[in-house]
C-alpha cells in the first residue's frame, strides 16, 4: 500500500485538504467551510438533481397517504 497522502480541494475555499483520519472536517478544510456548505444546502442553494417525483406532479391527486 502506498504511503502517499491524497489531497483534495476544499469544496468552499479550494484550500488543499489531506485525505487522512486526522482531517476532521474532510473534505472541508475547517468547521467554517463545513458550516457554509451546510447553510447552502439548508437555503436550497444546492440540490441533488432528480426527476420530479410522481406525487409532486399533480397536487390535486389524492391517495391513502394524503391528509384529509
UniProtKB/Swiss-Prot annotation:
Repeat recorded as keyword: no
Cofactor(s) recorded in Swiss-Prot or TrEMBL: Zn(2+)
InterPro entries attached to this UniProt entry: DNA_gyrase_inhibitor_YacG, Znf_NHR/GATA
Residues engaged in binding Zn(2+): 10, 13, 29, 33
Gene Ontology BP, a term: regulation of DNA-templated transcription
A Pfam family it matches: YacG
Superkingdom classification of source: Bacteria
Co-factor: note: Binds 1 zinc ion.
Gene Ontology MF, one: DNA topoisomerase type II (double strand cut, ATP-hydrolyzing) inhibitor activity
SUPFAM superfamilies for this protein: Glucocorticoid receptor-like (DNA-binding domain)
UniProt entry keywords in alphabetical sequence: Metal-binding, Zinc
UniProt function note: Inhibits all the catalytic activities of DNA gyrase by preventing its interaction with DNA. Acts by binding directly to the C-terminal domain of GyrB, which probably disrupts DNA binding by the gyrase.
Quaternary context: Interacts with GyrB.
Family: Belongs to the DNA gyrase inhibitor YacG family.
HAMAP family associated with the record: DNA_gyrase_inhibitor_YacG
Name this protein carries in UniProt: DNA gyrase inhibitor YacG
Species the sequence originates in: Haemophilus influenzae (strain PittEE)
Gene name tied to this protein: yacG
